[in-house]
Amino acid sequence: MTHCINGQWLAGEGETVIKTDPVSGEVLWQGRGASAAQVAAACEAARGAFPAWARQPFAERQAIVEKFAALLDTNRVELSEAIARETGKPRWETQTEVQAMINKVAISLRAWHVRCPEQVEGESSVRHRPHGVMAVFGPYNFPGHLPNGHIVPALLAGNCVLFKPSELTPLTAEIAMRLWNHAGLPQGVLHLLQGGRETGQALVQQPQVDGILFTGSAATGYQLHRQLAGQPEKMLALEMGGNNALIVEDPDDIDAAVHIAIQSAFISAGQRCTCARRLLVRRGAAGDAFLARLAAVAATIRVGRWNDEPQPFMGSVISPQAAEKIYAEWQARIDAGGNVLLPMCWPERSSALLTPGIIDVTEVRDLPDEEIFGPLLQVMRYDDFTHAIQLANDTRYGLACGLISPQREKFDRLLVEARAGIVNWNKPLTGAASTAPFGGVGASGNHRPSAWYAADYCAWPMASLASADLSLPDTLSPGLDFSVNKEAE
């Protein structure tokens, strides 16, 4: 059975979905997507379940979410292996992802009490109310952790949720849904709707949906924004990636700097929203030495299948089709005059395994300002730090920016001048924390950061003035007279 609608597992009635191993081509999951009628039924059930769920005491909602975290812990081996098989990521990475899912529960609880506490000051009070029915669109790069970062705070706030995972990671979503059911969620509170574009379109068009929480490409995010134009009553939270820059400024430990660059560019085969896409290196002998060392170390990165032993640092990208697009972007930069520092290889066209590629594009004209979601690192040389900041900000995106440098004053300047939601110093760009907001500006989002700030878009504030005493004020406003006909009464 493909979908979980109103507590029942059902076969789909929509388009056929087949998920294969990114490397071997083995079929891992198959079914049919949710039809428009099934999406409508799920929305209706969620709307019906919402009043009781929203009124349920917070402590009871918390207990269910904490039970889910305990079930994640118990089932971590099965879930981490499913993520690895679907995404191609090595085991060590997917085990870390499941741990992040577990940690998200306690973090979301703390965030709720910090971001959305009930406040009373005299006759004034503030409390927070859930939106209603929220649609969560999950990405494929972190198919467990990233949807979890929307679902957990949404449920804690008292919302009902319609979860549409990526069609490239249906198995992970199915396992997570079964764990939620075992945790004791009331019927109708959380629904799983598998499928591709048709299912997603049907979900967005549902009038019962009060908000959409999305993580994915800028193209899809912009499409969602256009579709919801003229509907300001609906919450829309978009996280859309970036063309992120990492600046290298005279590091005093070249190997440490190289390690940060590799972690920033090639972890998860370059399939993290905050991965470095552009590496900015000062012109001169020191910059040349850094790049030579980077290319030499990156050439030794072990690339392999999710279950290879010894474990690889980098697995495959999500599909052979994705590998083809990434490799085409690599070739396009060579054709445009880029200088290859480390050649990207695609050994088997039927496989999604790529090796890291590094190319100097300093002299390439009209370089596309796009997020290449894979292990392709573009080097740009700069003259001075002012030039470096100009290059870093020369993008329509604004998710992440980083600096490798021993000079604190350079980082202080970057904090003021960088146009990015995440700005790191001597840390990988991919080192985001759930205890901080996660999001960007420009084409990277719509000012609805997730992680620690997810509670903000899962509930709306209600302000109240209240008094138990009903009486006239001691002093009336000018022009009012309550003495008229008083004696006659």
Swiss-Prot record:
Which pathway does this polypeptide act in?
Amino-acid degradation; L-arginine degradation via AST pathway; L-glutamate and succinate from L-arginine: step 4/5
> What is the annotated signal peptide range for this record?
none
Superkingdom of source: Bacteria
**Residues holding NAD(+):** 216-221
| Active-site residues, as the UniProt record annotates them | 239, 273
Q: Which GO terms describe its biological process?
A: arginine catabolic process to glutamate; arginine catabolic process to succinate
Look at the named UniProt entry and state the broad enzyme category this protein falls under: oxidoreductase
UniProt keyword NAD, yes or no = yes
Reaction catalysed by this enzyme: N-succinyl-L-glutamate 5-semialdehyde + NAD(+) + H2O = N-succinyl-L-glutamate + NADH + 2 H(+)
The record, for InterPro entries, names: Ald_DH/histidinol_DH (IPR016161), Ald_DH_C (IPR016163), Ald_DH_CS_CYS (IPR016160), Ald_DH_CS_GLU (IPR029510), Ald_DH_N (IPR016162), Aldehyde_DH_dom (IPR015590), SuccinylGlu_semiald_DH_AstD (IPR017649)
What are the disulfide bonds? none
> Keyword NAD, does the record have it?
yes
Its Enzyme Commission number(s) read 1.2.1.71
What are the alphabetically sorted keywords of the record?
Arginine metabolism, NAD, Oxidoreductase
Q: Write one Gene Ontology MF term.
A: succinylglutamate-semialdehyde dehydrogenase activity
* PANTHER family xref list: ALDEHYDE DEHYDROGENASE-RELATED (PTHR11699)
By sequence similarity, the record places it as follows: Belongs to the aldehyde dehydrogenase family. AstD subfamily.
Q: What is its biological role?
A: Catalyzes the NAD-dependent reduction of succinylglutamate semialdehyde into succinylglutamate.
Spell out the protein name for this chain: N-succinylglutamate 5-semialdehyde dehydrogenase
Q: Which gene encodes it?
A: astD
